[in-house]
A protein has these predicted regions:
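N-terminal small-domain helix-loop-helix segment of the aminotransferase-like
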Residues: 1-48, 55, 104
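Structural element of the ATP-grasp superfamily
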Residues: 30-32, 81, 168
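Short acidic capping loops at alpha-helix termini that bridge into adjacent secondary structure
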Residues: 39-43, 63-66, 112, 173-174
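Conserved coil-to-alpha-helix start sites within the AMP-binding
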Residues: 49-53, 73-77, 185
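PLP-dependent aminotransferase-like
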Residues: 59-118, 128-131
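Active-site pre-lysine segment of PLP-dependent enzymes
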Residues: 99-112, 124-147, 152-187
């Protein structure tokens, strides 16, 4: 055998097979540990961002819904809601260093808006909104009972760690934080 005895023992005792639909309890506990105030029961593990976005959009939206998407955004975060319901894009202001205007978000809302999608640290600009803007988005969603889906896959890669925002799932009861292992953790 090519493996050292301790490696062979570890491999032979490894559990192989299908796992729980929501992710293994140890994995979910480890993920919950990266958040403040979340329990393993608050975590769903997916094979990747695409699957997470797909499931979230189909769980939260229907043909009678409306979603507001801060653009540009990850392609699936723009196209999946559009395949389900009416959407409105709110563009970041390029000439203002990719600023997000919360008043524009408010104007884009409809009585049947169920979801706002954001992406910070932003891909492709790298923009991180300031805490006051972030809090204003959370407040807007909370006041209207709107879900807030936050693509946070580049969290942890901020050039200035003091600008790191809280994870939406930590601060808002209807907040969904999407993260992956391939960016900040460098895993495939």
């Amino acid at each position: 055998t090519l493996a050292a005895p301790e490696d062979r023992q570890a491999f032979d005792s490894m559990r192989l097979g299908y796992v729980e639909t929501m992710g293994t309890p140890p994995l979910r506990a480890a993920i919950a540990g990266t958040y403040t105030g979340l329990a393993p029961e608050d975590v769903l593990a997916f094979a990747g961002a695409e699957e997470g976005i797909f499931c979230a959009m189909h769980a939260l939206l229907d043909k009678d819904s409306h979603a507001v998407i801060v653009t540009p955004n990850y392609q699936s975060s723009e196209t999946l809601p559009l395949s389900i319901c009416a959407t409105t894009g709110v563009a970041l202001r390029e000439r203002e260093n990719w600023a997000l205007d919360v008043d524009e978000l408010h104007v884009a809302l409809k009585p049947y808006t169920k979801l706002i999608l954001i992406n910070f640290p932003h891909n492709p600009t790298g923009k991180v909104i300031d805490r006051a803007t972030f809090d204003a988005v959370v407040t807007l969603c909370r006041e209207r009972g709107i879900y807030l889906f936050s693509d946070e896959v580049y969290r942890g890669l901020e050039r200035r760690p003091e600008l790191q925002l809280p994870q939406v799932a930590e601060v808002y009861e209807r907040g969904l934080s999407l993260n992956v292992m391939s960016k900040a953790y460098g895993l495939p």
